[in-house]
């Protein structure tokens, strides 16, 4: 706007100036003479120059004004061209529409002058009108200029006011902020004021309570003073009462001492009376025995007086012959015992040598190439093994000499020679057993009392049946204190079964209250004597004590293999027990035992009475029985072998043969029997192979219960599912409580002491069974040897052939009275037979388990919780069985390969792989049941029952995933369905939470 105004003003001024320039040269006077005209023209030139200067100055001033206006209003310069085209240029063209004429020289001055005059007049008339019009226009422009200047001044004032307004707004904002701060301080001060008012009110209440409490304290102090005064009086009374009671107590003490003295005297009298009664009863018993013996002696005298001399000689000869036969039998038995003793001592020394060598090799010895080691001796035996073992022990001892071995385990490997004193004791017992009852000088009554029993006692003492636990108390205590090495404990692991079949005796270590051993009166034997050299066979007793004292030696000796050895031993015991039970269930009712063995099934044991030399039975009264019960002794009659019916030898059936020739009989698995001079082979450790080589360090731990192999179940059916692991971890983060993993191993502990008690009870009170076992040993030797040959020569490539062979072997061995009691008297391959049975029963158990998991059907009629528990228990059973197998699989494979047993079923591609695949199907059924229950359960998504059910399903799936090593396609589909339900629930929960938060924000 201002630019237009300024430009119009400048244009108008310029137009006026140009007009003046055009008018002034055309104003000369009328034409006259040349002189006048020239003078006039000369007179006009100075004025014209002055006007030009004035016009230039005015134009410069106007230009300065225009520049000033343009500099002030430079903001609207962009619209200048539009304004020039629209408004100014037309006016400027109107002003300049007339042509400007300039005087030009001409020859015809007159004509030109006339024409100029005429034109001048016309122009003057036109210029006058135009001048008037321009004057009016100038006036209008001046008025317009004044108006625009006023507007410009007003604009400048408004612009100054705008800056003032901005400043005022800024100050207003500052003031509002200050007002807000003041309001906040006012509110805080008001809140503090309210708090102070509340505190003042509370302080007033507290002051009132304080005053009340002070008043109560004053009252209580007054009461305390009153009570103190009263208690002082009561204390004085109590002191007087106590002093009187003390006086009475002293008097009572004096009376008590007198009463005690009297009671002691009465007790002494009672003891004396009881002693006299006991002596009187003993005298009565002795009198009765003497009368009985006197009657028997008189009867013998009468019979002898009636007999002729020839009859007496014949009877004496008969007795001499009987005694000779008995003596010969005893000598043979003693020789057999001595030979057994020699072989046992030789075996013990050899095993101790091997033990020392093995300890040295395991600790710090590397066997050079081409040189024999003790481990080789334990595997490959020959008649020269004893000499080699002795040479190795001397070599190791020489290498360790001077090193100052302070190993604590060396105490276990020191060879103790238990032979010399035991041999002396045995020979002394065998030679002086009949006269040991007369070794002391008792009184007359005791001699008379023992006279009738000397013959029976001597027969009992000299009988080989007393050889079990025949050591003296000192010997037993020393054997209890000694700790044996691990190889000795392995040698005597079946020590409870290594007793001679004709022995029975007394066990002092066993508790009398066990159900296997009836609480019967003890048998009076040679062991009750006090002489130090008693007992024919102290080896059995020492071995029995050793078997009790070395239970934990393996743990102390080889701690590195302690856990694996325990697991192997427990599994072996468990499988043996199952095999015995299965064999008893299958063949127990078909075995025809001799009539005498029918007594074994009866719990009642009849103790026969004493038979005298003439065959008369002693009849004692109840009074004598009560007297004998205090002594806890009884006598046992001698049973004869001819009373047991011997069965004819059994002809074994041929073993089953596989169609593909899986069993071969020409393998070198059967070792030839060693000569009598060579040491017996050391037994393998129970449940496993030999210890690892010394150079290789401890064996690698069993592989963790890991993933199923790629080849298991055919192809890549099972693969890892990281989605399941992530989902399980996310759920477990939300779960605050963590459940403990169930234990994976349920190891059954074999009660060896119960078995030992049962065996001892058989030995002590059921000798008929032992005689029947001896009859089988004598008659079924060829039968057992043929079975042993078949077992040694057996080798299999198919596990089904092994099952058939084990079934045949159990059926054949069921013919024997007692398998182990008979087989221990022969060269029976116990290790291989046990391995065959162990593999067969383990395979059958795994197949039953796999069938149980595969055939499991989820009953829809069953409620949710029992159905899920049923599947969970089945999974726990599967895990326990598989993990227990995996922990001992390496040792079992090496052992089975040694005996020619197939091991492919133990790998992950065998039965174990099938079980893992079946567990994946079980997980699918579990997840489907959980999904079905989630759909059927009514309630909100935040219901804890739904969350717990979902978490339970994911936990089960994760557990099976880790156990089987992955999921198949169907199980993954079931898992995705379960996870989709969880995601929908979590999405709904998130939407609800967002809606709730939006509502809270809108309320706020």
Curated annotation (Swiss-Prot):
What are the start and end residues of every segment in region (Leucine-zipper 1)?
269-290
Q: Where is the composition biased (Pro residues)?
A: 670-706
Tell me the membrane topology, using the record's own terms. Peripheral membrane protein
Could you tell me the keywords of this UniProt record? Answer: Chloroplast, Coiled coil, Membrane, Phosphoprotein, Plastid, Plastid outer membrane, Repeat
Q: Name one GO cellular component term.
A: chloroplast outer membrane
Give the disruption phenotype, in one or two sentences. Answer: Defective in chloroplast photorelocation movement, leading to damage of the photosynthetic apparatus and subsequent bleaching of leaf color and necrosis under high light conditions. Chloroplasts gathered at the bottom of cells, regardless of the light conditions.
Tissue distribution is: Expressed in cauline leaves, rosette leaves, stems and flowers, but not in roots.
Domain remarks in the Swiss-Prot or TrEMBL record? The N-terminal region (1-25) is necessary and sufficient for targeting and anchoring the protein in the chloroplast envelope membrane.
Q: Which domain of life is it from?
A: Eukaryota
- Chain positions found as Phosphoserine: 399
Q: Which organism is it from?
A: Arabidopsis thaliana (Mouse-ear cress)
Q: What is this protein called?
A: Protein CHUP1, chloroplastic
Chief location of this protein?
plastid
- Where is this gene product found? Plastid, Chloroplast outer membrane
Cite the residue spans of the region called Disordered. 22-63, 398-482, 504-536, 612-718, 736-755, 979-1004
């Amino acid at each position: 706007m201002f630019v237009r105004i300024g430009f119009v003003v400048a244009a108008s001024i310029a137009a006026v100036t140009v007009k003046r320039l055009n008018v002034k040269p055309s104003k000369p006077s009328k034409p006259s003479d040349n002189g006048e005209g020239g003078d006039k023209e000369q007179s006009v030139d100075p004025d014209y120059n002055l006007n030009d200067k004035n016009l230039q100055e005015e134009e410069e001033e106007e230009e300065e004004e225009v520049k000033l206006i343009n500099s002030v209003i430079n903001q609207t310069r962009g619209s200048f061209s539009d304004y020039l085209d629209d408004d100014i240029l037309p006016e400027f063209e109107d002003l300049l529409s007339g042509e400007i004429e300039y005087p030009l020289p001409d020859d015809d001055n007159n004509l030109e002058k006339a024409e100029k005059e005429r034109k001048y007049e016309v122009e003057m008339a036109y210029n006058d009108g135009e001048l008037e019009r321009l004057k009016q226009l100038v006036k209008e422009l001046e008025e317009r200029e004044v108006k625009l200047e006023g507007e410009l001044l007003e604009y400048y004032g408004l612009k100054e006011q705008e800056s003032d307004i901005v400043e005022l707004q800024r100050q207003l904002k500052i003031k509002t902020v200050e007002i807000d701060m003041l309001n906040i301080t006012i509110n805080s001060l008001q809140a503090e004021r309210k708090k102070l008012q509340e505190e003042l009110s509370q302080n007033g209440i507290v002051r009132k309570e304080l005053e009340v409490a002070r008043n109560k304290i004053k009252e209580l102090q007054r009461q305390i003073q009153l009570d103190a005064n009263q208690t002082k009086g009561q204390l004085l009374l109590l002191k007087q009462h106590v002093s009187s009671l003390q006086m009475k107590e002293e008097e009572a003490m004096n009376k008590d001492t007198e009463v005690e003295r009297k009671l002691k005297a009465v007790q002494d009298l009672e003891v004396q009376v009881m002693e006299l009664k006991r002596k009187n009863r003993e005298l009565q018993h002795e009198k009765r025995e003497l009368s009985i013996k006197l009657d028997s002696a008189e009867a013998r005298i009468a019979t002898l007086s009636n007999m002729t001399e020839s009859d007496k000689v014949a009877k004496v000869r008969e007795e001499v012959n009987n005694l000779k036969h008995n003596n010969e039998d005893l000598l043979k038995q003693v020789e057999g015992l001595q030979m057994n003793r020699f072989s046992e001592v030789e075996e013990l020394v050899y095993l101790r040598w091997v033990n020392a060598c093995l300890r040295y090799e395991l600790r710090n010895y590397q066997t050079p190439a081409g040189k024999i080691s003790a481990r080789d001796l334990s595997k490959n035996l020959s008649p020269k093994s004893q000499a080699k073992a002795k040479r190795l022990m001397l070599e190791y001892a020489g290498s360790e000499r001077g090193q100052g071995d302070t190993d604590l385990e060396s105490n276990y490997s020191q060879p103790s020679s238990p032979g010399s004193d035991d041999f002396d004791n045995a020979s002394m017992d065998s030679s002086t057993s009949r006269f040991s009852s007369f070794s002391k000088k008792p009184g007359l009554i005791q001699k008379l009392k023992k006279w009738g029993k000397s013959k029976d006692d001597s027969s009992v003492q000299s009988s080989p049946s007393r050889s079990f636990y025949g050591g003296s108390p000192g010997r037993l205590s020393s054997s209890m204190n000694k700790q044996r090495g691990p190889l000795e404990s392995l040698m005597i692991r079946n020590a409870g079964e290594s007793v001679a079949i004709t022995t029975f005796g007394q066990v002092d270590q066993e508790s009398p209250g066990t159900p296997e051993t009836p609480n019967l009166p003890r048998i009076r034997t040679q062991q009750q004597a006090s002489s130090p050299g008693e007992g024919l066979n102290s080896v059995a007793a020492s071995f029995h004590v050793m078997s009790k004292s070395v239970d934990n030696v393996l743990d102390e000796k080889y701690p590195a293999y302690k856990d694996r050895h325990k697991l192997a031993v427990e599994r072996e015991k468990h499988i043996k027990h199952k095999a015995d039970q299965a064999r008893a269930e299958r063949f127990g009712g078909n075995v025809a035992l001799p009539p005498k063995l029918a007594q074994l099934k009866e719990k009642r044991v009849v103790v026969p009475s004493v038979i005298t030399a003439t065959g008369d039975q002693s009849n004692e009264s109840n009074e004598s029985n009560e007297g004998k019960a205090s002594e806890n002794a009884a006598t046992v009659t001698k049973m004869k072998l001819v009373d047991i019916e011997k069965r004819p030898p059994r002809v074994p059936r041929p073993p089953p043969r596989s169609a593909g020739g899986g069993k071969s009989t020409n393998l070198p698995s059967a070792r030839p029997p060693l000569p009598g001079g060579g040491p017996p082979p050391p037994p393998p450790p129970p449940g496993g192979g030999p210890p690892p080589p010394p150079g290789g360090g401890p064996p690698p731990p069993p592989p963790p219960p890991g993933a199923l192999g790629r080849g298991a179940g055919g192809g890549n059916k099972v693969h890892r599912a990281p989605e399941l692991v992530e989902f399980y971890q996310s759920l477990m983060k939300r779960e605050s409580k963590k459940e403990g993993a169930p234990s994976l191993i349920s190891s059954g502990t074999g009660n060896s002491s119960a078995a030992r008690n049962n065996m001892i009870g058989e030995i002590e009170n059921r000798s008929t069974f032992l005689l029947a076992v001896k009859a089988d040993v004598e008659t079924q030797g060829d039968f057992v040897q043929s079975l042993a040959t078949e077992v040694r020569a057996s080798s299999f490539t198919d596990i089904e052939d092994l099952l058939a062979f084990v079934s045949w072997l159990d059926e054949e061995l069921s013919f024997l009275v007692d398998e182990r009691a008979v087989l221990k008297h022969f060269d029976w391959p116990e290790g291989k037979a046990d391995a065959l049975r162990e593999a067969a029963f383990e395979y059958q158990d795994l197949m039953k388990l796999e069938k149980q998991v595969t055939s499991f059907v989820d009953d829809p009629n069953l409620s949710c919780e029992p159905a899920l528990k049923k599947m969970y228990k089945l999974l726990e059973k599967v895990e326990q069985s598989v993990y227990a197998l995996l922990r001992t699989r390496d040792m079992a494979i090496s052992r089975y390969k040694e005996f020619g047993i197939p091991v492919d079923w133990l790998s992950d591609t065998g039965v174990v792989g099938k079980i893992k695949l079946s567990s994946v199907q079980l997980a699918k059924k579990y997840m489907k049941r959980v999904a079905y229950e989630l759909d059927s359960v009514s309630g909100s998504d935040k219901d804890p029952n739904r969350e717990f059910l979902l978490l339970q399903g994911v936990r089960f799936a994760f557990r099976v995933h880790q156990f089987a090593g992955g999921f198949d396609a169907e199980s993954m589909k079931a898992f995705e369905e379960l996870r989709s339900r969880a995601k929908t629930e979590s999405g709904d929960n998130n939407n609800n939470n967002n809606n709730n938060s939006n509502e809270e924000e809108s309320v706020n």
